[in-house]
Amino acid sequence: EKYPDIVVCGTVGPCHDPSADYIEGWRFAKENSRYIDMVDEHYYESPGWFLNNQDYYDGYDRKAPKVYLGEWASRTRTMESALVEAMHLCHIEKNADVVVMTSYAPLLCKEKHHNWNPNMIYFDNTNITLTPSYHTQKLFSVNGGDRYVASTLRVPEGLENRVAASVVTDSKSGKKYVKLVNALPSALKLNVNGLDISGNTAIEGFRGMPADKAVQPAD
């Protein structure tokens, strides 16, 4: 009460549901929600986990403390991980009323001197290597908005978890951001209905094969 500007962040352990730390941490946070503003979640998972959990935050209690996803990543330093991480960020933007902050971790690692993999940026005495995951984080960091626009993707049956999208707008600039992630082995044709994207339109992105450790600019 004396320091209303202080935000109290609790912890729910190093793993996601259904770990014991996660369950007990959330129980404590909800019971003490008067004092706990948000909780810090951590998880590192396989690309397959991210593909199959694109609804992870949909069922979260909107009245509970918020989520700071303080450490997270897919477990390889490849294009595949960059794609599934982008899918997860699309899902997080959809649930921005629950997940208020995210931070990829770890960030920096010297080649051949690491005790954790993956990291976002690798370096040695002369070179810097940016992983595909770096490019995902960069795109989302500079193409944000303050309003999420509900959208629907229509893709062939059985392929729903291989494609993701997020649409956000910026109320100050009037800009609209349509984010599309395609983890299929073929290109997609995109038709945008219900959103005026005429006028000045710019395309940013990258592409590559699943095992690639470097990216190519989008055509």
Please name every model-derived segment.
Residues E1-P4, G10-F28:
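N-terminal catalytic cores of secreted or lumenal carbohydrate-active enzymes
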Residues D5-C9, F28-E80, G158:
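Glycoside hydrolase catalytic-domain groove-lining segments
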Residues G25, N53-Y56, M87-H88, S133:
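A general structural detector for well-ordered alpha-helical segments in enzyme core domains, enriched
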Residues A64-V167, S171:
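Aromatic/acidic polysaccharide-binding cleft in carbohydrate-active enzymes
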Residues E160-G199:
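Carbohydrate-binding surface patches
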Residues I197-D219:
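Acidic, Ser/Thr/Pro-rich beta/coil linker or hinge segments at domain junctions
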